[in-house]
Every structure is written in structure tokens, then in C-alpha cells.
Amino acid sequence: MLLGPASGAPSPLLASLPLPTRPLQPPLDFKHLLAFHFNGAAPLSLFPNFSTMDPVQKAVISHTFGVPSPLKKKLFISCNICHLRFNSANQAEAHYKGHKHARKLKAVEAAKSKQRPHTQAQDGAVVSPIPTLASGAPGEPQSKVPAAPPLGPPLQPPPTPDPTCREPAHSELLDAASSSSSSSCPPCSPEPGREAPGPEPAAAAVGSSMSGEGRSEKGHLYCPTCKVTVNSASQLQAHNTGAKHRWMMEGQRGAPRRSRGRPVSRGGAGHKAKRVTGGRGGRQGPSPAFHCALCQLQVNSETQLKQHMSSRRHKDRLAGKTPKPSSQHSKLQKHAALAVSILKSKLALQKQLTKTLAARFLPSPLPTAATAICALPGPLALRPAPTAATTLFPAPILGPALFRTPAGAVRPATGPIVLAPY
């Protein structure tokens, strides 16, 4: 038994003594225990006759005991313009060849093309700072002076100096820079980042000129006579050569228009003749073109005026006769005669209908039988005579053949019925 502080620290004596140690067990190797391997061709080592098997058996064995194939990553094909995702390349190719994709692609290209001139105009409006050549010394070399970058397609870049001339005078450089800057962008300001106010009034002037052109075009494509606006010069020309425009022009000149083969005034084809009376309040209108002063009548055309001149009414007035007024008595007589004729026709039709109905419903021997019955005296006058019965019913309605019994039995006789308990 060891006591003292030496028990806490390992003793050299104990360290020198041989102590039995536990042997370490190696890890189990399943390859020595199993007859087949986990890698490579496992079915080949497990089944010796694998190569001579049926293809179906080979597929089943390789699927069951074979090494699992790595999962293939699914490819996603998408269209960023139409925001669609496809399952295969064939679907994507069919979509790219379709009309929907083509329409959207054209719309995107049109939007981009509209944005390009706007951005170019903004780039041209923004002016880059011009290098200060006056601050440099007269003896400064030319290579340190940078050339101004081009400011867009409509602006011309400043002329670059010839590389052969290396030492031009400083005044020539200043003149060239000032001329190039004035020719390229005259309203530019030397401060960087500030836009020139020149393009805005120019755009306003262009807009006003375009609106003025549009108004003038609308004015050119308008017919003030017919109050019609058309869309093109060809339509205006066709309208001017049309019948409606010609009628409106003739109406303005006072000439009669023609409607379905007969001349009609501008007031319309359905207007009736109007009597000319004095204007209200002593105001008189212009003298009509077709007017009969004798009858105080205004018509719409020359043909109507000729018809009026040849009418009986005008001739009577010309001869000094008073016009015959249309009396109410004559109209009543006409209506009464018409009503009488209608009533007569109705009565004749009713008589004819009664005759035809009586002839259809009553047989021909009935009147003779009735006269024979009425001729018999005594209380038996209403008894029908045998001749009348024979004439009314020449043959029996229900003959004896209808009630004749059949030759054989209608139903065969059945045997006796025996009732017995079970």
C-alpha cells in the first residue's frame, strides 16, 4: 500500500513493471465473409452463368444486385421573353418557331428601337468637359492634350491632329479646339454634368409644327360643302366625284337634284307642294324657282309645275271658274253604298252555305217519307211506315253473322282438378 504524495503521480517502479495489455481487434472485413463484391460487376461474381442468361433475367439481376446508377440532373429549358419552361428540347424548339414567340420578340425589339433614339438624344444633350488648353504652358507637348470623344451619330468628332506634325503652335491648337467645339455643339456649356437647354425648345417647335401639319392635313381632307372628313386624298377625290357631292353642289347653286329618275329640289324627294303665303311680320323670303302665281302654289321641280299647268284645277282657275269644293255628302254616299254592297254579298254567301249543308247532312229519301207520314190520318199518323223503315235502314246494322257461335270450342275443356294435401 502506497501512502503519501507519491500516490498522485506515477511511480517509476510501476512504470517498469510489465503490465498485460488488451489486444486490439481489427475491423471486420465483409469482403472475406461474402462471396461477391460490392463494387464493379457484382452480378458477374455472384452468378457464374450470368453471360449465358436470358436478356430479361440479366436486366432483372443487374437492376436488383447491380450498382445504382447516379441520378441525372434534369435540364430546365426556359424562354425569358415569354416566361415559359419546357420539359424537352423539342418543346423549346417548337415554341421558338411559333407565332406567339415571334410576336413577343418583335414587340420587345420595337420597344428597344424606340428607346434607342431617346437615349441617343439624351447622350447628345449631355456635354463632356472640354480640356482647358489655356491653362497649359506654351511649351507643353501635344501628346498631353486629349482629343474630345464623339458625341453620338449626328455630332461630328473634332478633327484629330496629324501625327507627323508634333510641334504646332499653341494658338493653332486653341483655334482648332474652339472651332471644333462650336461646330459640333454650339449651345454646349463648359460645366460637366449640366444639360443644354437647346433641345427642349427645339422639340417643342417640332411638336408644334407636327400638330400644325396634322391640322392642315385634316383641313385638306375635309369637304365643307358636305361636312365630311376623310382619311386620305384618294378618298377625298372619290367623294368629290361622287353623286352626293354633286347633289350638294347643285343644291347650293339652286339647281334641282334628281332622285330616282325625277328632278327634286334640295328640300328632299318626299316634300309636298306648299302654298306661297306672306312671311310672318311682313318679312318675305326669296322668290321660289317653281311657282304658279295664279294658283298661289309652289312645287319642287319643273315636271311638277308642268303637271300642275296641265291639270283641271289650273285650267278652271285660268278660265275664271270657281273650284268645286269637295262636299261631305258625297263622301257619306260613297261609304253607304260600299256598306250596302258588303251586306248583300254576306247574305248571298250565308244562303249558299245553308243550302250546301242541308244537302250534305240529310239523305234524299227523307222528304218523301215525311210527306207519307203526314198524309196518314188517325192517331197512328206518327208511326213510321215499313217503306220508310226500309228506306232509312236498307240493311241491318248488326247482322246475325256477328252473333253466330263459332264452329269449335272457344276454349278446350280441362280435366278434373284434384286437391290433395302434401
Swiss-Prot record:
InterPro entries: Matrin/U1-like-C_Znf_C2H2, Znf385, Znf_C2H2_sf, Znf_C2H2_type. SMART domains: ZnF_C2H2, ZnF_U1. It is found in: Nucleus. A zinc finger (Matrin-type) spans 77-107, 225-259, 290-320. One of its GO terms (cellular component) is nucleus. Residues 147-162 have a biased composition (Pro residues). Keywords: Metal-binding, Nucleus, Repeat, Zinc, Zinc-finger. Residues 255-277 have a biased composition (Basic residues). Residues 164-173 have a biased composition (Basic and acidic residues). One of its GO terms (molecular function) is nucleic acid binding. Residues 107-218, 249-287, 303-333 are annotated as: Disordered. Pfam families: zf-met. This is Zinc finger protein 385C. It comes from Homo sapiens. The lineage of its organism: Eukaryota, Metazoa, Chordata, Craniata, Vertebrata.
